[in-house]
Amino acid sequence: MARSIKKGPFVDEKLFDKVQKAVASGNKSVIKTWSRRSTITPDLIGHTFAVHNGKKFIPVFVTENMVGHKLGEFAPTRIFFSHAGDRKSKVRK
């Protein structure tokens, strides 16, 4: 079920404070965050976030197309190693 419109989008307070400080100082450095659950709002456009994927931080540059999505959507947590090929048929031929 979607979040109520009356509540508004969720953005972690600490993350929002970091963005406000960056805007006030004019600093465009990477903002490190563990808050994958935060919704991207128009205030975050143009900033680069280092989003934690459980192992390392993935740089995510926020654009207009990302508004309404979550930060965690752009930092995948799982790596897909392709399924093992059919080695027996290659060896027999």
Curated annotation (Swiss-Prot):
The keyword Acyltransferase does not apply. The keyword RNA-binding applies. Signal peptide: none annotated. One of its GO terms (cellular component) is cytoplasm. One of its GO terms (biological process) is translation. Keywords: Ribonucleoprotein, Ribosomal protein, RNA-binding, rRNA-binding. PANTHER family: RIBOSOMAL PROTEIN S19P FAMILY MEMBER, SMALL RIBOSOMAL SUBUNIT PROTEIN US19M. Belongs to the universal ribosomal protein uS19 family. Protein S19 forms a complex with S13 that binds strongly to the 16S ribosomal RNA. This is Small ribosomal subunit protein uS19.
